Amino acid sequence: MQNENPWIEICPGIKRQTKTSGKTMYQMLATLEAGSKMPAHQHPQEQIVHILSGRMKLIVDGTAHEMKTGDSYYLAGNVPHGVETIEETRVLDTFSPPRDEYLAIDAANRQRT
Protein backbone atom coordinates (compact mmCIF):
# COMPACT_ATOMS: atom_id res chain seq x y z
CA MET A 1 0.00 0.00 0.00
CA GLN A 2 1.41 3.37 -1.04
CA ASN A 3 1.78 6.01 1.65
CA GLU A 4 -0.03 9.19 0.58
CA ASN A 5 1.05 11.21 3.60
CA PRO A 6 3.37 14.10 2.75
CA TRP A 7 6.90 14.63 4.04
CA ILE A 8 6.77 17.56 6.49
CA GLU A 9 9.81 19.52 7.68
CA ILE A 10 9.81 19.64 11.49
CA CYS A 11 12.89 21.87 11.71
CA PRO A 12 15.84 22.54 9.37
CA GLY A 13 17.25 19.23 8.11
CA ILE A 14 14.60 17.06 9.81
CA LYS A 15 11.51 15.74 8.00
CA ARG A 16 8.77 13.33 9.04
CA GLN A 17 6.15 11.23 7.28
CA THR A 18 3.21 9.62 9.04
CA LYS A 19 3.29 5.87 8.40
CA THR A 20 0.13 4.77 10.24
CA SER A 21 -2.11 5.62 13.18
CA GLY A 22 -4.97 4.18 15.18
CA LYS A 23 -7.07 5.07 18.20
CA THR A 24 -4.20 4.74 20.68
CA MET A 25 -0.99 4.78 18.58
CA TYR A 26 0.80 6.82 15.91
CA GLN A 27 3.92 5.95 13.91
CA MET A 28 6.14 8.11 11.73
CA LEU A 29 9.37 7.87 9.79
CA ALA A 30 11.87 10.70 10.24
CA THR A 31 14.93 11.57 8.18
CA LEU A 32 17.63 13.67 9.81
CA GLU A 33 20.49 15.26 7.88
CA ALA A 34 23.98 15.10 9.36
CA GLY A 35 24.49 18.05 11.73
CA SER A 36 20.78 18.79 12.12
CA LYS A 37 19.39 19.54 15.57
CA MET A 38 15.97 19.40 17.14
CA PRO A 39 15.74 21.69 20.16
CA ALA A 40 14.62 20.33 23.50
CA HIS A 41 10.85 19.91 23.60
CA GLN A 42 8.27 17.76 25.34
CA HIS A 43 4.82 16.36 24.66
CA PRO A 44 2.30 14.34 26.66
CA GLN A 45 2.66 11.24 24.46
CA GLU A 46 4.91 8.32 25.32
CA GLN A 47 7.45 7.76 22.54
CA ILE A 48 9.65 4.91 21.36
CA VAL A 49 12.57 5.99 19.16
CA HIS A 50 14.06 3.26 16.93
CA ILE A 51 17.13 3.98 14.78
CA LEU A 52 16.79 2.38 11.32
CA SER A 53 20.12 3.74 10.09
CA GLY A 54 22.73 6.30 11.10
CA ARG A 55 23.86 7.80 14.40
CA MET A 56 22.53 10.59 16.59
CA LYS A 57 22.56 11.89 20.13
CA LEU A 58 19.23 11.79 21.92
CA ILE A 59 19.39 14.31 24.74
CA VAL A 60 16.93 13.33 27.47
CA ASP A 61 16.41 15.73 30.37
CA GLY A 62 19.91 17.14 29.74
CA THR A 63 21.72 13.78 29.41
CA ALA A 64 23.06 12.74 25.97
CA HIS A 65 22.62 9.15 24.76
CA GLU A 66 24.47 8.22 21.56
CA MET A 67 22.29 5.96 19.43
CA LYS A 68 23.17 3.92 16.33
CA THR A 69 21.44 1.61 13.86
CA GLY A 70 19.25 -0.91 15.69
CA ASP A 71 19.06 1.01 19.00
CA SER A 72 15.72 1.91 20.63
CA TYR A 73 14.85 4.27 23.48
CA TYR A 74 11.63 4.74 25.46
CA LEU A 75 10.58 8.28 26.44
CA ALA A 76 7.86 8.83 29.02
CA GLY A 77 5.38 11.63 28.34
CA ASN A 78 6.37 15.20 29.25
CA VAL A 79 10.11 14.41 29.48
CA PRO A 80 12.26 17.12 27.82
CA HIS A 81 14.27 15.72 24.90
CA GLY A 82 16.06 16.85 21.77
CA VAL A 83 18.38 15.53 19.06
CA GLU A 84 21.82 16.24 17.62
CA THR A 85 22.45 14.25 14.44
CA ILE A 86 25.97 12.84 14.02
CA GLU A 87 25.42 11.39 10.53
CA GLU A 88 22.44 11.06 8.21
CA THR A 89 19.86 9.10 10.21
CA ARG A 90 16.48 7.42 9.66
CA VAL A 91 14.26 6.95 12.70
CA LEU A 92 10.97 5.14 13.26
CA ASP A 93 9.05 6.92 16.04
CA THR A 94 6.00 5.42 17.73
CA PHE A 95 3.75 7.51 19.99
CA SER A 96 0.84 6.77 22.31
CA PRO A 97 -1.64 8.37 22.23
CA PRO A 98 -1.45 9.63 18.62
CA ARG A 99 0.08 12.98 17.67
CA ASP A 100 -3.20 14.61 16.64
CA GLU A 101 -1.43 17.84 15.67
CA TYR A 102 0.69 15.91 13.13
CA LEU A 103 -2.38 14.15 11.73
CA ALA A 104 -4.11 17.53 11.30
CA ILE A 105 -1.07 18.93 9.45
CA ASP A 106 -1.02 15.85 7.19
CA ALA A 107 -4.73 16.26 6.38
CA ALA A 108 -4.29 19.96 5.58
CA ASN A 109 -1.36 19.21 3.25
CA ARG A 110 -3.27 16.46 1.44
CA GLN A 111 -6.12 18.91 0.76
CA ARG A 112 -3.69 21.35 -0.88
CA THR A 113 -2.41 18.79 -3.39
What function would you assign to each model-found segment?
Residues M1-T24, A104-T113:
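A short, N-terminal "cap"/entry segment at the start of jelly-roll beta-barrel domains
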Residues A30, L58-V60, L92, D100-A108, ...:
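Anionic, Ser/Thr-rich low-complexity intrinsically disordered regions
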Residues G62-N78:
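Short acidic-glycine-tyrosine-enriched beta hairpin
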Residues L52-S53, K68-T69, E87:
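A cytosolic small-molecule/anion-sensing beta-strand core signal
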